[in-house]
Curated annotation (Swiss-Prot):
UniProt xrefs under Gene3D superfamilies: HUPs (3.40.50.620), RNA-binding S4 domain (3.10.290.10), Tyrosyl-Transfer RNA Synthetase (1.10.240.10)
GO CC entries: cytosol
Protein name: Tyrosine--tRNA ligase
Subcellular location(s) per record: Cytoplasm
UniProt EC number: 6.1.1.1
Domain S4 RNA-binding: 346-413
Gene Ontology MF annotations: ATP binding; RNA binding; tyrosine-tRNA ligase activity
Keyword set, alphabetical order: Aminoacyl-tRNA synthetase, ATP-binding, Cytoplasm, Ligase, Nucleotide-binding, Protein biosynthesis, RNA-binding
Motif window: 'HIGH' region: 39-48
Lineage: Bacteria, Bacillati, Mycoplasmatota, Mycoplasmoidales, Mycoplasmoidaceae
Protein family per UniProt: Belongs to the class-I aminoacyl-tRNA synthetase family. TyrS type 1 subfamily.
Amino acid sequence: MHNLIKDLKARNLINNITNEEKLKKALAENKGIYVGFDPSADSLHLGNYIMIMLLKRFRLHNIKTFALVGGATGMIGDPSGKSAERNLLDKTILEHNITKIKYQLEKFTNSQVINNYDFYKNMTFLDFLRDVGKLININYLLEKEIISSRLDVGISYTEFSYNLLQGYDFLQLYKNDNIAIQAGGSDQWGNITTGIEIIRKSLGDDNIACGLTINLLTNSEGKKFGKSEKGAIYLDENKSSVYEMYQFLINQTDADVEKLLNFLTLIDVDEINKIMQAHKENPALRIAQKALAQAVVVDVHGQQKYEQALHISQVLFNGNINELNQEEFNIAIKSLPTTKLDKDEIKIIDLLNLANISSSNRVARDFLSTGSILVNDIKVNDENFLVKKQDAINQEFSIIKKGKRNYFLIVWNKD
């Protein structure tokens, strides 16, 4: 067995393989592999990162890797895993998303990026029906879970056709780009096998087209990985700060962290086992979570940004916020729960309730009496203490700290 496949299995990444013998042959003959990415947003997120890492793993084994951006399929929307019709993207937005995602894929995977719109821009509807539609039987499509699961609630002809488009993509890549392997999440099995069937119908049984699916990355509660309470953690630091990504990863549960180390990092499996052993001996040190956060943040944003996120975290949880420089302060406050005020002063007890730091006056008094509340790093015990705009940082921000680790941002209205 190819060492790469052994590694993928050891990490429990592989969900299914269409034909393992064809996969071995494709790897032996130096055929390429591709993964499709949906341009539904203008940045990829941590949920996509497992497939980015898959391409990196293949590339490290000197296998040609390709990333396909759905310039055509993105106009329709993949029905896989959806219970209702997706909203269609405006063409201008779609083109913007494609440009941004193409840049990210080239940066993170060093793969050739292909836009599948190029396959269809000169094809008429009649061409598609004649050259693609005739290859696949309706009954074949109705047996697909992505189709059958939507029959009761309804599926448009647009989304019904998506399976054929993704399948035709594989045929074009197989014929023209020496690509024999398609990979995707486990929800892509139906689309991948349709592509293999289209190749078989077009080129005969001697083809070596094959597919492999990767286990979906879910947490111990069965929820898809990659979203915080505020939403997706994006790879674009203008949409999600490096600090937010670091915090999201460092706060993963003990139940999830070993899987995440295997799925999202290039750390050797034996080394991951050693990390987990050390972690289990003293879970409070969060050795595994620290290894995960460092590996992913350095890979996505670089060592310097990782060190900056680490410093912000250390200051917020162990030190004085005044230790942050201006850039670090601006990054930190973007991630904090925020309350806006259009007055010049407010009693601390009222502010604690207004900002949802406390649930009642009684709880607020408890926080104050036990010394749990700091305003701009000054401890406050008096419930009548006035928090004033004139004392705010740059007369714009006040930072409320509750306990050791909970920060809240107060934004004063500018005159």
